[in-house]
Every structure is written in C-alpha cells, then in structure tokens.
Amino acid sequence: MYSLLRPALFCMDAERAHGAGLRALDLAYRSGTLGLLASRPAPLPTRAFGLEFPNPVGLAAGLDKNGEHIDALFALGFGYVEIGTVTPRPQAGNPQPRLFRVPEHLGVINRMGFNNAGVDALVANVRAARRDRGILGINIGKNKDTPNELAHTDYLTCLEKVYALADYITVNISSPNTAGLRELQEEQALRELVSRLREGQETLAARHGKRVPMLVKVAPDLSDADVDAAARVLAELQVDGVIATNTTIARVGMENHPLASEAGGLSGAPVMARSTAVLRRLRTRLPESIPLIGVGGICSGADAAAKMSAGATMVQLYSGLVYRGPALVGECVESIRRRREAPSSGVAHL
C-alpha cells in the first residue's frame, strides 16, 4: 500500500508531505484500515533499562514532536515510540523550507530547529492517548533562546513535567539545528548538565515512587576522543542508556549533490557508517549495564542487524520509513530475530 502512497507524498514539499502522511496514518488507524499499510510483527520481547519491550524496533524522535499520533504509530508494530523533541515553551523552529529529501542517497536533510507546541501541549496529548501497547519515550530539549549556562533549567522543567507519563526520557543535546546545543556534549558541560539531571531524576523517583530511565542522545560528528570523554562521563554518572546517534552535519558521499550545501542535519543511509562506528566505539567504552539504542541510516533489516552487531540492544527508525514505509518495521524485527536465533550470534545484548 505504501508503494502506492509514496509517489503522491513525494510530489509534495517534504514538510507538507510529513503532515499529510501523519493525517493519513490517523485516518487509517481510526477507520481500521491500518493493516493495509503493514502487518504487525510477531513479538520479540527485549529487556532494557529495566523495561520490557514488545520488540526491539522503535520510532526515533522527530516524527511526532507533540505526541499527537501515539496510538496510530504503535499500531504500525513499533515496540516503542519516542515523541518530541519537546521544549518548555512553544517555538516555531527555523524558517521554511527546512526539510529536504535526498532520494538518490536515501537521505533527508532537516533544519527544523525543535519546532514544537511546548511541553504542556505534549503532556495533554499523552494523557489523551489510549497507550494500550508498547513503551513510550519522551525526548526533551531546550528552547533556542535559553543560553547554555541555563540549559539545565529547561531540561529540568521538561523532565519534571513528563516524568509521570514517560516510560523513559531522552535528553537531546545533539541536534545540529539549535545554535550551540552540541557544545553541551563537551566533557565538562556534559558532566555539569547530566549531574543536575541525574539529581532531578532521583528526586522525581522518590516523589513519584517509580524510577523512570533517562537516556542521553549523542551526535555522530564527535571525534573519537570526544566519544571517549562522553562515555567516561555517562558511565561515571550512571545514565540508564545512550542513543547513538543523531543526524550529521557531514555530507560524506554526496558532497557534489545540489542539496549538499543546505544547512542542517543529514539522516538516512549517508549517516549509517559513521553512526554505527560511534555506536561500536561507545559499546567498547561503556559498561554492559548501560544499553545502547542504535539509530541512524537504517533502511533495511540488514542495517538493523548491523546495529545489533555493533553493540546495540535495540534500534530506532525514522528516515528509512520515508523511503520504505511501515513494512520496514517488521523487516527489521525479523532480521533481528534471525540474528538472535542464529547459533553464531552469541548472547544478545539485553
């Protein structure tokens, strides 16, 4: 079915198609015809961060920034859905156009800039959702006009407001589309920010009587030395997990493409190699007690299996869905299942 819808979506501007696709998804969900888009994969239970996931294939943050489509997205077969990135106050993001397909390379360039309706709107949407399946992650960020020295206040505001509703929370310090945000990945800044957030997490755990896991999402453009430094800090502060990686500002393999000069983060197939290299390096430098989610460039089941081989416990999709549609979810689940069941695969990272 998606093969029939895709040409119509690709005739539209990428951001308009994004909205149209989500509206079509909701319509199919409400009318009971979502099964025509993709069949739900058989369960492949996976344990991570103290949570039980129906399967290890999730939706990455960015597709549903405000949590308006949670139930429909779960119905596509994802084991978990991550919504956001959300900020304390609503913000419009960067000027349009700000989203570009690169079909020749199965890539997408975006400079959205954390456009979202604000954390209060997201909280209301989450409360209105049925949430009768899967694990819900909420990705939090800072407003663009909040200076880095006060960034912790934005993250703590979001952490507190979403804590009771999230199954896990992701701290996004790696988007290239908010000026200066990636500076928070530098060793000292990272230590200061995550220390404050860990304190907030423990305070909220005591208040709510439950501990919600907190993950940190990192960039693929970190040098090896910076990856090592980040790993030291995140291990020292005992974060619950790491997501590797966000989009890249590099244009490897498409340097001469007409869109290569567009500012923003590149996702999809072009980021697969570097993202997986960062994932692999993190796995060798973090204790096994800190699971990794591999995201970046997954356009096939083989790509998902490659992330698992590099040390991921689970994976996330986004740009691959643009080109492959919802069938990619089941394909990735089955590829990971085959890898897990293969005698040579050893013990899966759980």
Curated annotation (Swiss-Prot):
Gene Ontology molecular function, alphabetical: dihydroorotate dehydrogenase (quinone) activity
Enzyme class: oxidoreductase
Reported cofactor(s): FMN
Enzyme Commission number, as recorded: 1.3.5.2
Recorded topology in the membrane: Peripheral membrane protein
One GO cellular component term: plasma membrane
Function: Catalyzes the conversion of dihydroorotate to orotate with quinone as electron acceptor.
Protein name: Dihydroorotate dehydrogenase (quinone)
Protein source organism: Flavobacterium lutescens
